[in-house]
Amino acid sequence: MSAVASSAPSATTSSVMTSEVSVCNKALRYLGAPEIVALDQPSREADLCARYYAEARDELLECHHWNFATRYTSLAPLAAVPPFGFAWAYRLPGDCLRVRRLRDSQPFEVVEARTLYTDAAPAEAVLTVRVTDPARFPALFVEALARRLAAALAVPLMNSTRLEQSMLQRFGDALDAARVADAAEGASDPVELNPWLTAR
């Protein structure tokens, strides 16, 4: 089996040419697996990358208050009267992954059907949103995403729990570096990791 790559980017590495395929190929190189030219090509590597990429991306976006994925917005009110003693109900945007806070730290609760309950009116929120354009990802975020994707691919593609554990460990290191660099550019809120990020 090919040796697992160990190189990591610097914080200043450009991500201008980053694409979904390039992130997937970075993960495949870490596993010593063949690279792909498209996510819809007829190969097991492409099929598995297409299956796991979006899930890995969204989970990674959720686990930290990334500056590049932050949106400040006024939520749209709903006509429905909320239960649980809250005065107002609001609709969350379709690309919202996590509500970080409301203005003036007003209490809130997020429930099913992408609805937020609160007493605040209007509800001005800080959100983490889904970013689908990889060209917007900082270089260290790309590194963490590739490591996490490599961990997800290790067993179904390479049949190797050893590689999976190695990639999870390196993912943890890459995530720490990405968080530190992101925090240096603005305030961030630490968030508990989703279990999917730390174990299968």
Segments the model singles out, each with a brief description of its role:
Residues E35, W88, G186-D189:
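Polar low-complexity intrinsically disordered regions enriched in Ser/Thr and small residues
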